Amino acid sequence: MIGGIDMKRVEDIVKIVSPTKVEGPVTAVVSHITADSRTVQEGSLFICLVGATVDAHTFVDKAVEDGAVAIIASKPIAVPDHVAVLYVEDTRQALQDAVPFFYDYPASKMRMIGVTGTNGKTTTTHIIAHLLRSQGYTVGVIGTVHILIDDQSYPIHNTTPDVADLQQILQQMVDAGVTHCIMEVSSHALALGRTAGVEYDTAVFTNLTQDHLDFHKTFDNYLAAKAKLFKQVSASYQVKEGKGAVINVDDAYGQAIVEVTTAPMITYSTEGKGTMNASNLSVTAKSSELTLNYGEASYTIQTKIAGLFNVYNTLAAVGACVYEGLTMDDIVKGLRTFTAVPGRFELIEEGQDFAVVVDYAHTPDGLENILQTAKKIVENRILVVFGCGGDRDATKRPIMGRIAAQYGDRVFVTSDNPRTEDPVQIVKDVEVGVKEGLRDGVDYDVIVDRREAIFAAIAEAKAGDVVIIAGKGHEDYQILKEETIHFDDREVAREALKER
């Protein structure tokens, strides 16, 4: 055993990846597996991936120097005699096959719940985790905010980690006694095969709106990536019971997901279209109440989270927990004690007579959702501070500008994470849409410095206003061209409130 997993030798990996050629000894023990040359250690199996800009075959010498006992490659390489080389046609496929095997397929030892969609994944996963935890289960969460193993939180860099990292995390969860793992499953992860070796028991679809077209190129590709999760659950349902899908049929693309799903499903709606429906909605700045109709019964649901979008997130979580065996009475009781996820419609309170909300909304639909919620609860004006990220789908910039101007009474266009792009050009792209959407009496400012923009909006706010600071939510950094700096919208908002 190595760290809770069965010992593997190079010859065991050979059986899994079926190489076209093997050179060198195959009896060495593999104690670690990676596709990142920076993490190679004594006993590692190093897999040479060929990316868009980097070819890992160029790092073989360093990997051997750092202790690699075997290399998986698709191109001829020269290594010392004591290092094994497994030649394959597709190293990425080899990675997807070898890593889950190395970790003894940890996902098969837990209930796996996958949540996919453009918006709502984080809140939905956290509601599911809260409800399961309230019934005594030991829970793991993998998502945008963090990795959570029982009550321990760890930082994360991708919504869904790469194959090697994901399998290692899942093994840590198994070692910690986790019974249920709830994952945000991004379209990137599904398209790139990052979830290889993971068989989901419950799949949840929240919604599909414009995002990530810089990666997927077309909306059809984006939809197809999301649909993979439901095809997989449907296929595995043929051989294993206890599978289910939970699908938002109010979303324009929900029906497309329904059509590819042959596993049992719960469809949810606020318009009476689903097998689980919400009615009698009442939303305030800090809470929501609704009637949930499922089967022959109706239940009064009370939560401490606001917004129609959170009603949908709640329905998604309820559906998932039904498949996980929770009773409706337990679900209703558990929902009363759930509080907002960091950076998701998070109220910043410093005793002021107006509301300040920090939210992760970084898509057109996400921004419109929070502004619609603000419209329902505001007594006076809506002030919007937002920007768009660099090196990402540029077509959504004017769309988001138009939405901000249509709903906001005062708009502050600023930077988000400009990355390698010129922040001035990004705000100009956004400004095009702002000008198109401006209503009579609405004004806007362009303040490239995000800190200054937040301070300006809060300084201008009056009693009864709502200040929406959108785009970064829980993030505590800002990615600039030359560096990544510490930056937290919530901290800056508190500073601005204290200086008023």
Which ranges hold each PLM region?
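ATP-dependent carboxylate-amine ligase
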Residues: 1-19, 45, 319-329, 333-336, ...
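N-terminal leader/targeting and accessory segments in enzymes
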Residues: 2-97, 252, 274-277, 302, ...
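Phosphate-binding loop of NTP-binding sites
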Residues: 14, 95-245, 253-261, 377-378
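Well-ordered beta-strand positions
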Residues: 45, 70, 202, 244, ...
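Short glycine-rich anion-binding loops that position phosphate/pyrophosphate groups of nucleotides
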Residues: 51-53, 77, 187-188, 210-211, ...
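Short internal beta-strands
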Residues: 69-75, 245-249, 385-386, 410-416
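Acidic, Mg2+-coordinating active-site environments of NTP-dependent enzymes
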Residues: 78-82, 202-355, 433-440, 445
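Structural beta-sheet core signal
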Residues: 141, 183, 203, 247, ...
